[in-house]
Design a protein with these regions (language model features):
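NAD(P)-dependent aldehyde/semialdehyde dehydrogenase
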Residues: 89-202
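C-terminal core of ALDH-fold dehydrogenases
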Residues: 148-151, 188-284, 307
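Extended low-complexity, polyampholyte segments enriched in Ser/Thr/Pro and acidic residues
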Residues: 79-81
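Short, glycine-/Ser/Thr-/acidic-enriched flexible segments
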Residues: 1-2, 13-14, 21-23, 48, ...
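Rossmann-like NAD(P) dinucleotide-binding subdomain of oxidoreductase/dehydrogenase enzymes
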Residues: 1-71, 88-96, 305, 309
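General beta-strand structural signal in soluble alpha/beta enzymes
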Residues: 18-20, 41-44, 138-141, 231-234
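Structural signal for hydrophobic packing residues in well-ordered secondary-structure cores
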Residues: 11, 15, 32-36, 49, ...
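Extended hydrophobic packing segments that form well-structured cores
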Residues: 284-310
Length: 310
């Protein structure tokens, strides 16, 4: 903590990148804002990455959805920032099929070793707290005992109702590890109400059919305001480094919704724009001269090109 504080407050520091807890990221953000000359903090913090499994998808492939969900949940012992920590669906026999298959796979999963003893302890405390809540049940947990001395943890899937989820703030807190909560909603209206009440997250996922997308068009519009990456019929743990990737989201997922921490645009967090007006060509930086010596992509008079400018 002292080292982080010193780095943020050092006069030569011009910007800060951070991945960690909401408390840690907010502390650094506040320190940077309190400087005589404030600097930006690009903090990536907690995210539960909600997954919505819609009726058409569950009817067609409930078991296949579980086959994709459990590996995403347990990947890296649940320590990916895109770990799917919430699943929402209508409370019916189709969701029963998904939960049944998910439970069977989780029970067969092997315990995993977490990165540090502190992370492991926080995971056990968080999951135990959720388990103790009224109206929350354990659907499944890894069947093998763990060695806490080796920082091992079990995968756990909880179940609760939409009504309980709405009244229990703790269910909206990240359990950093292989744990997820399946929320059984009583209606489409309740699903939309829950979505409107969500905080900011890195990702949101919808599994559905084309018909589901039309039926739940309002849900898509709601999630557009809640997440940085909206996924259809896939799982959130795959994060490709490419120009189209946006790995960010509304607060408290990050402290600046406009930037990504993954992908080619990530470097823009640490650039400062400057415009040159009226300079002769030979006085400009090489990249801005008429002759494109480096053959780089440039925008000239609104057109993207590698050609020389006239």
């Amino acid at each position: 903590h002292d080292v982080g504080q010193a780095l943020v407050q050092h006069p030569l520091t011009r910007a800060v990148g951070f991945t960690g807890s909401q408390r840690g990221g907010r502390a650094l953000f506040d320190l940077a804002a309190a400087r005589a000359e404030p600097i930006p903090v690009y903090a990536e913090m907690g995210s539960l990455n909600p997954v919505f499994v819609l009726p058409g998808a569950l009817d067609e492939r409930a078991e296949a959805l579980a086959d994709g969900f459990v590996p995403s949940l347990t990947l890296g012992v649940g320590q990916f920032c895109t770990n799917p920590g919430l699943v929402f669906g209508l409370d019916d026999d189709k969701l029963d099929r998904f939960v049944s298959r998910t439970s069977a796979l989780v029970e067969q999963a092997a315990p995993g070793t977490m990165l540090t003893a502190g992370i492991c302890e926080a995971y056990h405390e968080g999951s135990s707290g959720v388990e103790s809540l009224s109206g929350v049940a354990v659907a499944a947990r890894t069947g093998t005992d763990v060695d806490r001395g080796k920082t091992q943890s079990q995968a756990i899937v909880f179940e609760t109702s939409g009504t309980t989820f709405l009244k229990e703030p703790q269910l909206s807190e990240e359990m950093f590890g292989p744990a997820s909560v399946v929320v059984r909603c009583k209606s489409k209206a309740q699903i939309q109400k829950i979505a409107r009440n969500l905080e900011g997250h890195l990702t949101g996922t919808i599994h559905g059919t084309n018909e589901d997308l039309h039926e739940y068009a309002a849900l898509v519009r709601i999630l557009e305001r809640k997440v940085g990456r909206l996924i259809f019929n896939a799982f959130p743990t795959g994060v490709e480094v490419c120009p189209s990737m946006h790995h960010g989201g509304p607060y408290p997922a990050t402290t600046d919704v406009h930037f990504t921490s993954v992908g080619t645009a990530a470097i823009k967090r640490f650039q400062r724009p400057i415009a040159y007006q009226g300079f002769p060509d030979d006085a400009l930086p090489t990249a801005l001269r008429n002759a494109n010596a480096g053959g780089i992509w440039r925008t000239v008079n609104g057109n993207v090109s590698r050609e020389n400018a006239s």
